[in-house]
Amino acid sequence: MKQIVALFLFVAGFASGQTSHFPDLEWKEKDLDHFTIRTKSTGTDPARRYSEKTYEVMLEILPGLEGDFEKNEFRTPGGQEAGKEDRFRFTTYLVETDHDFHSCVMIDAKRHNWSNGNVQITKQVGNYLDQMNRYLVICKSDPEQSGGGREKDRKEILVHSLGTALMKSRTHQADLPFWMTAGMGYYAEHKVFDRCSIYYLDFEAYYRQNPDAKVDARKGGTLGPQESWPRILRKLCKGEKRVSLEKTLGAQIVTLSPNESGYIFALNYFMVSTNERTKKYQGFITSIRTGAKPTKDLLLKTMGYGDDASFEKDWYEWMMSSKFK
């Protein structure tokens, strides 16, 4: 099954943090330790089941999340608090129907001056993250089907999006490169489900049009939701089908390939694959939080490398080892 997550660059001024993001809609509410779940005409899963699991995964590599949440040190990219409560809770909105989802989209479109193109794409995809890192909205049925139809399993979208959102919240930034946001979403998926299922392109169509991109024409030769991404990527790396650091950092949705998606995941995983690397990754995030741009030079410097070649040597060796699993 193909699942696609929304990831757009919305350019707008930043309003003050709000506790009630869609006050004109009626919500049922449930608080978890670090999350508030608001539902309309549907249940609290998958948020009730997987939100705290995702938080624990991200807390292991970004311990500063504890202060952001439990001491309410969270700040939007514009520097505002999310609310006046004693602690911050990230909010997940779950709606059943396309009508309610479209209502949320239009409220945010007006609030942040979205373009018509972004509005239409968001309505089609059926999920989006708040650009100020405070909440996530998911339509649990088909957002393009009138009345919604049957609810779908959205747990992968939830975990992927929360992984992205929690990392972004530590940077106090709205505009981060695709390799960081998508890659950390994939990392969270892998840690929670031992697989990656969220696509930013149609993998099946890509492989039909580009059969040489497969590792092997036989079973297990392509990246997909039923395959172990580390196993396939290990084959790619050993087979010299490698994506350079430069190309991985410059990946864009419009030109993305499945292999680039895999290397984006592998890069983020590599950067937190040992305690030493995790501390350096935390330094990278802290630098961005204090205003630095997430450039290749900053990444190499904070991770302790002088050039692309030395970074790639360690990265590829790790990918080809049994430690990448």
What are these regions (language model features)?
Residues 22-177, 294-295, 299:
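Juxtacatalytic substrate-recognition/specificity segment
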